[in-house]
Amino acid sequence: MMTSVPPRKSWWTSKKTVKVIRSYPTFPSLNAWEKFRGLLPVDGETNPGVGLGVEEGLLCQMVHSPEFNLFPNSVVFESNFVQVRRSRNWKEIYKASNTMALGVTSSVPCLPLPNILLMARVKWHQGQSQTWNRPSRAPSINLKSILPLKFVELQIWDDQERVLRLRTVTEKIYYLKLHPDHPETVFHFWIRLVQILHKGLSITTKDPTILVTHCLVPKSLCSPGGKTELVQKKSKGLQPSESLTHLMAQGESETLSQIFSDLHQQKQYRSEKMHINKTSSEKATPCEDSIPCTCDLNWRDAFMFGEWERENPSGPQPLSLLGTLAASSRPRLSLTGGNSI
């Protein structure tokens, strides 16, 4: 007689598997943080810069249009001004229907500072509301100037009347009064911009050891003793690349001084020659070919242009040189008068 024995259960089948669910803290998305901080506009609301008339204005739309297609990836900071005449009451030069659009942008979006100035003449239709971004009827806008900020001096001339003074390298001076429709915040933006262009940012401080000619931006005012100490401290801590730039700038300055000295020496020789010819025609006079010239420009053959003047520099450049590097869009810029810079 066979007895049935129940099968024994395996030891591993008696284990129970427990599913552990780990909980991670949930963070809001980046857009949610930006909306909370007010850095990005909420859906349905306009960009604060657009509402103030400093972004995506008429000047930006014109330079980004297919007709011009200038700096398509760069942001344009702009405002509308009224050109005035210097006097107690700042009288307007043109009619109220004529305004001046003034803006700054960067030739390359990655630059830490703007390096291009844009000016355009705007003529509004009679009775038209001067809205900056999307006017119902497009006004007549004429691009007047595109200038590197290297060749422009921008000053706050009258903060009470919100007047800027603009001087170009051709000594053309404009007095521009911020349009009354712009709020006071916009003028504070221009004050901040002028301060940045004059003094630079913490990452784009202007190196006084770098000689950049034809720059109308005034240097920082400081005592002679403090300036000398500052330059000496910077010279001690210069890196190899900065030392090379410093030597190049110093050598160019010394070369210019030597050229002026040689010209003065030639002038003295010529005056003596004329005096001797008048007194006696028999005496031998030194010829101009024998005039000594101690100027040596061989070192310029290897460095035709400084690191901040090269159009396509090799290798990454320091941020402190990017502003002047981009301002010099070409090694030599020909002006209307025919001079080369």
Curated annotation (Swiss-Prot):
Record localization: Golgi apparatus
A biological-process GO annotation: acrosome reaction
Similarity annotation = Belongs to the GARIN family.
Spell out the Pfam families in the cross-references: GARIL_Rab2_bd
The free-text tissue note of the record is: Expressed in testis (at protein level).
Q: Does the keyword Transmembrane helix apply?
A: no
State the gene name recorded for this protein: Garin1b
Q: Which domain of life is it from?
A: Eukaryota
Query: InterPro entries of this UniProt entry?
Result: GARIL-like_Rab2B-bd (IPR022168)
Origin species: Mus musculus (Mouse)
Protein name stated in the entry: Golgi-associated RAB2 interactor protein 1B
Question: Phenotype upon knockout?
Answer: Mutant males are sterile. Spermatozoa from mutant mice showed abnormal head shapes with an abnormal swollen acrosome morphology and impaired acrosome reaction.
